[in-house]
């Protein structure tokens, strides 16, 4: 499947039309950003590892009952996906406190939460992706009650499935964000990506950070850490 026209360009991914009106090509670039785009850098090889990492995770979730937009990997940096009508919402689950919630609530980094904590955020870089709740979503027409409940249900299921996958590879899934959209058949599918760019993964013994916090905090070895996570999961990352 060939790319025809770029229709969306984000901070680290682009979407292209194809000969099929229901399918898009998702391209993963080496571009890396943090703090709503205020810190930027190109990290050689990150796009390839993220594309193939995402495919591995999406395939694993599909096998465990989570419908996703992923169809197939086309090459090292491109994947074919279903075209969706996206919700302008990020769904976040936290198993431990880290990042923005520590700043917001003054909690210690790494605090183990009694239960997984679910949060909604509005997807808007200019506003800093503000925290929102169900009432905001319904009042502004971003999703209805049934869609909200389905997104919550699927996000919790993603957490259950992936926590087990990662802990079996000596990794702690600290938190993650996911996005959803509606396909042409009307089903809500997991969309966008699941990579170390959008989750926190710590070594279960040393608590070493293996995710994009290495970029945010200037720890270095970002792509190398992504490869280490992929290796632990048994992936064979190919670079064209």
Which ranges hold each PLM region?
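Active-site loop/lid in soluble adenylation, ligation, and acyl-transfer enzymes
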Residues: 2-122, 233
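A long amphipathic alpha-helix within ATP-dependent nucleotide-binding catalytic cores
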Residues: 142-174
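A short glycine-rich, hydrophobically flanked beta-strand micro-motif that places a catalytic Asp/Glu
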Residues: 71-76, 166-181
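Short histidine-centered catalytic/ligand-binding loop motif
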Residues: 38-48, 132-154
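C-terminal helix-cap and adjacent tail motif
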Residues: 111, 194-240
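Conserved metal-phosphate-binding beta-hairpin within the catalytic cores
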Residues: 93, 173-192
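Basic/polar N-terminal segments that are highly enriched at the extreme N-terminus
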Residues: 1-4, 238-240
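Phosphate-binding core of ATP-grasp and ATP-grasp-like enzymes
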Residues: 111, 116-128, 159-172, 194-200
């Amino acid at each position: 499947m060939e790319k025809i026209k770029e229709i969306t360009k984000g901070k680290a991914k682009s979407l292209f039309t194809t000969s099929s009106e229901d399918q898009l090509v998702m391209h993963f670039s080496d571009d890396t950003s943090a703090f709503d785009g205020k810190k930027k850098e190109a990290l050689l090889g990150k796009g390839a590892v993220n594309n193939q990492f995402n495919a591995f995770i999406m395939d694993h979730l599909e096998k465990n009952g989570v419908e996703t937009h992923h169809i197939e990997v086309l090459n090292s940096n491109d994947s074919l996906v279903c075209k969706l009508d996206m919700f302008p919402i990020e769904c976040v689950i936290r198993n431990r406190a880290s990042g923005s919630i520590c700043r917001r609530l003054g909690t210690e980094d790494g605090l183990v939460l009694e239960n997984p904590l679910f949060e909604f955020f509005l997807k808007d870089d200019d506003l800093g992706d503000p925290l929102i709740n169900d009432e905001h979503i319904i009042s502004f027409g971003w999703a209805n009650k049934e869609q909200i409940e389905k997104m919550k249900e699927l996000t919790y299921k993603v957490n259950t499935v992936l926590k087990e996958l990662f802990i079996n590879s000596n990794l702690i899934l600290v938190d993650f964000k996911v996005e959803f959209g509606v396909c042409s058949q009307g089903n809500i599918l997991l969309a966008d990506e699941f990579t170390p760019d959008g989750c926190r993964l710590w070594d279960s013994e040393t608590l070493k950070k293996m995710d994009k916090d290495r970029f945010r905090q200037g720890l270095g070895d970002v792509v190398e850490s992504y490869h280490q996570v992929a290796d632990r999961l048994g992936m064979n990352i190919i670079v064209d």
